[in-house]
């Protein structure tokens, strides 16, 4: 399936969105992945957009990378390779949002690379069913579906085939 590509240039910034729908033939689980690249120049950091972007999607798994590229100069001409404080991407995400997820950081401070992965803690099965009320399903079926969902999420989150 081919789609359209749209790139918008916003003055000194840009946002690019890539979508990846896919379907597993054995488990009947469908996933929809969205990659969003946000780049800014100047005083506005893309980190300030995280709460808005996370709130705009109903995401079960979130993977975020933040990289500081290049440098700027202070008023005396000294190069600044990091012009703001950061130890974790999580520092820029609302506490209420973080409470809904398990979050892990993998950062390379020397290279100004920051990586955070988040996995939803609670699964509301009704959100994953189409044209079916969760209570129409027998308890064992609900449990089996929830188990399949959780296994799929853990594999996507970890980036490896576990089950």
Regions found by a protein language model. Give the residues of each.
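Polybasic/polar functional segments that serve as interface/processing modules
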Residues: 1-163
């Amino acid at each position: 399936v081919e789609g359209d590509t749209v790139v918008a240039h916003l003055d000194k910034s840009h946002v690019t969105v890539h979508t990846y729908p896919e379907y597993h033939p054995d488990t009947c689980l469908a996933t929809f992945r969205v990659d969003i690249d946000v780049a800014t120049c100047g005083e506005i950091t893309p980190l300030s957009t995280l709460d808005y972007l996370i709130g705009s999607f109903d995401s079960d798994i979130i993977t975020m990378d933040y990289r500081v590229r290049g440098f700027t100069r202070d008023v005396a001409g000294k190069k600044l390779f990091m012009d703001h404080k950061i130890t974790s991407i999580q520092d820029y995400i609302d506490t209420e949002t973080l409470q809904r997820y398990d979050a892990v950081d993998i950062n390379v401070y020397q290279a100004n690379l920051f990586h955070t992965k988040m996995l939803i803690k609670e699964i509301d099965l009704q959100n994953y069913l189409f044209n079916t009320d969760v209570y129409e399903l027998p308890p064992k079926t609900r449990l089996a579906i929830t188990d399949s969902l959780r296994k799929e999420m853990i594999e996507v989150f970890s980036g490896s085939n576990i089950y």
